[in-house]
């Protein structure tokens, strides 16, 4: 897989070791960053989408990319990458937040997933590692029908969700308990009903590093529970189940100074971002180290050949 940087905030282009090691294609979209950060009107999103289409050229299933997008404030740009794909695929999302809020009049970084679920090429969505804003008051904005129909399969990080409609839905956390790391046996147990389907279609992965705990990611949001080994365990399992057919991937969750354009985005920033002080150099070093390990894992050893799955995982 090739690596590209969609540079909206300068967070990735500041990571010299990533640039030197992987020599990604860099697309300078810094001018767009303040105008789409956190949210944007659909008209603006379509203009940016056309710009990406011109820059990237035609989509080729045999030429898949790992796209680095910078801050999680730009996670809604994943939708533009998904809309470029023409063949059916399953979507794996690893994220602390649901990102599926309904009813918003604009495209928001916390709402893109419910739009992705409507794309005809997206067959099933697996949302893993979530913890925050699932069963609080925002549950009323969740795409309940899609979740109940298993169009979106939800596997929280460490706990069951216990308010509202979640009480009636079967869902189990990735960890058996708070202190037991995720392993292949646990993933097999949780995902066994979907293994044949995963085997039939290619996979797209969208990773927000806010699902990871603080020592391994410093984001513009709050941090999650998973460590890097667990994230790699999850990706390795899904890749193996999909026959290593990875149609594309994007990574968000780097930290950057927040620069927004317009009163509404400034309001969103104050309303939604946690107010904690972050040392910019520390954030860059931390996220660069994690990005390097993720990219090495994906490019050099995406699936450990020594791992053998039960025979039913290999059935067509």
Predicted ranges, named:
Residues 1-69, 73-90, 121-124, 133-134, ...:
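Catalytic cores of soluble, metal-dependent hydrolases
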Residues 76, 107-111, 120:
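Residues forming well-ordered secondary-structure scaffolds
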Residues 91-104, 108-115:
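Long, hydrophobic, well-ordered secondary-structure blocks that form the structural core
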Residues 94, 128, 252:
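Conserved residues at the C-terminal ends of beta-strands
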Residues 99-105, 125-128, 177-181:
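Flexible, glycine/proline-enriched loop segments at strand-loop-helix junctions
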Residues 113-127:
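Glycine-rich phosphate-binding loop plus the immediately following alpha-helix
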Residues 139-143:
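Distinct, well-ordered alpha-helical segments
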Residues 147-153:
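Short, conserved active-site loop motifs that form the nucleotide-linked donor/cofactor pocket
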């Amino acid at each position: 897989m090739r690596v590209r940087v969609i540079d909206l905030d300068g967070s990735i282009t500041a990571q010299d070791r990533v640039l030197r090691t992987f020599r990604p294609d860099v697309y300078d979209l810094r001018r767009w960053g303040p105008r789409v950060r956190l949210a944007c009107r659909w008209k603006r999103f379509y203009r940016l989408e056309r710009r990406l289409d011109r820059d990237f050229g035609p989509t080729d299933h045999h030429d898949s990319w790992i796209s680095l997008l910078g801050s999680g404030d730009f996670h809604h740009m994943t939708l533009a990458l998904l809309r470029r794909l023409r063949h059916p695929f399953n979507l794996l999302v690893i994220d602390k937040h649901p990102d599926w809020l309904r009813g918003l009049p604009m495209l928001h970084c916390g709402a893109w997933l419910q739009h992705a679920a409507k794309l005809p090429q997206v067959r099933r969505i697996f949302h893993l590692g979530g913890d925050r804003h699932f069963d609080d008051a925002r549950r009323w904005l969740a795409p309940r029908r899609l979740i109940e129909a298993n169009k979106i399969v939800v596997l929280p990080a460490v706990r069951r969700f216990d308010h509202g409609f979640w009480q009636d839905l079967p869902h189990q956390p990735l960890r058996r308990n708070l202190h037991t790391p995720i392993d292949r046996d646990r993933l097999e147990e949780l995902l066994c009903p979907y293994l044949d389907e995963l085997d039939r279609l290619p996979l797209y992965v969208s990773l927000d590093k806010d699902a990871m705990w603080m020592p391994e990611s410093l984001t513009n949001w709050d941090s999650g529970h998973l460590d890097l080994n667990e994230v790699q365990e999850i990706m390795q399992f899904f890749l193996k189940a999909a026959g290593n057919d990875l149609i594309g991937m994007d990574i968000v969750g780097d930290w950057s100074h927040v620069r927004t354009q317009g009163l509404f985005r400034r309001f969103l920033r104050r309303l939604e971002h946690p107010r904690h002080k972050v040392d910019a150099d520390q954030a860059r070093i931390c996220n660069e180290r994690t990005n390097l390990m993720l990219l090495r894992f994906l490019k050099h050893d995406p699936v450990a050949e020594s791992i053998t799955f039960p025979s039913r995982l290999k059935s067509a």
